[in-house]
Amino acid sequence: MATVFCKVGGGEEAVPKKEALNVINVIDQLPKPCPNPKFINRSMATKGLLLPSRRSLASFSEEENTDVMMHMPVEDSEYSSDDTSMSPIPSTLMNPIKMAVTQPNSSFFAGILEGELNKLSLASVVKNTEKDNLAICPRSSKSQIATRGLLDLDNPALDTDTSSTRSESSVVLDVPEVPFICEHTVGDSTAVISWTYAAGKQQVSFYQVLLQEATKPADKDTPKIKTRPWIFNKILGTTVKLMELKSNTSYCLTVRAANTAGVGKWCKPYKFATVSTDFNSFPETNPIQVTVQRKQPHRRTVSMTMEEMRRLEDLEYLYPY
């Protein structure tokens, strides 16, 4: 209730009249922000498979020149790479993922990795089942298409409205191609590895990297000792930086890609070696670094039809050797 004083006549103050006014709180009229209880950190993760040990299998750190520094615990967090682009020709200077390699842990890394892959395969089976059920409908909404596979939002061809014809969603139907390791740069304790993938074919969700110390030929009486591998999972970029490596040591690295259809094949083991540390000849402030680049061999497939083969037979008949 509010009291209003009115003036009447020649300015003399009359008896106050009370008038009932409905005072509306302006603040209540303002639109209230709708909190999102299911806030999801959409930074795609690059995570190494970890074990309950005092020493972590892989620890990541961001570049010093990044705009935002993410301080997250190693055990329970996933780390994102600045280099999330999947360019056919990666560069080692575009903020690669950093991985600190420590003493290898026990051998059930493979079991954890297979569990991740089984989940990935199970998800693809469910997606294929949903696709079969939705194929009965002549029209399918965009929301249904977005939940069944990986969509390239930058491609305007996929953003078409459905008409009387049956629409086809961008569902990954095959596993990715085998990556090709094209470049590496090594120092005394670090290594930057880059690879490419077949662009324009199957989409890639993430990569998996397996690193293993190369076995050296021992004496004849002593058998070779198998080293335990390091397995790094959910890598988004095409460049990784390995740190805390042993100097003057050979390593083998292999990469494979994965998407909703499953995982592809491992590439051929790529062998590299760190340089030796010689502080007498080279100062510590100017370490030695070696960069090696290679190109993927191009293969051409020649096909012949039956008519062309018959022409060759006719030529052999007309012009014998």
UniProtKB/Swiss-Prot annotation:
PROSITE patterns: FN3. Residues 175-277 form the Fibronectin type-III domain. It comes from the Eukaryota. This is Fibronectin type III domain-containing protein 8. Signal peptide: none annotated. It holds the Pfam family fn3. PANTHER family: FIBRONECTIN TYPE III DOMAIN-CONTAINING PROTEIN 8. InterPro entries: FN3_dom, FN3_sf, Ig-like_fold. Gene3D superfamilies: Immunoglobulins.
